[in-house]
Amino acid sequence: MKKTDIILIAVVAVIIVLGIVFLGKSEAKVEYDYPFTLKGEAGLVELTYSEYEEKIESNEPFIFIIERTTCSHCQNFMPVAEKFAREYNIPIYYIDTDKFEGDEWTGLEKSNSFFKKNSGNWGTPTIMILVGSDAVDYYQGETDSDGLYDFLSEKISLSTNS
């Protein structure tokens, strides 16, 4: 065998081994039955950090918004979210990060799959569909009622008050 053939075989073997190692470490994707039916009173519900942790631990699906009262995009979006929640009879939970104390930021950044994948690379408002610590889907930025409907309608059971 030529030296180049041996090198080629070694390179292919290394690629195969690395592929097996990395594929074996990939997270198992959880499959969900959509649409989710949400529990709770319709409307916008502010959570403290400890209440957010309780929602995560419940493993029930919920819509979660991260916002800041000092964020102009949040100021525009939150009234849209409130009207949407009432119109479609769903609870939408949110947390105001301007009210965080101590290590609540650190806790939030470790609390679900979205933050683990996007560490430090996100802004407000961010809307997530969470089941436990699994961020099933998310939308970053301000949107209108139609955009919110487009984001939520495939995964959340929506019915109007009419």
Predicted regions and their residues:
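N-terminal targeting signals for export/organelle localization
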Residues: M1-A42, S162
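Thiol-based oxidoreductase modules, predominantly thioredoxin-like and allied folds used
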Residues: G43-E46, I66, I90-K110
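Extracytoplasmic/periplasmic, Sec-exported soluble proteins
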Residues: L44, T69-N76, S119, Q140
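Local sequence-structure signature of Cys/Sec-based thiol-disulfide redox active-site neighborhoods
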Residues: E51-Y94
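Residues at alpha-helix caps and immediate loop-helix transition turns in enzyme cores, especially N-
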Residues: N76-F77, G107, D144
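Short, solvent-exposed, Trp/other aromatic-anchored flexible loops in extracytoplasmic proteins
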Residues: E109-W122
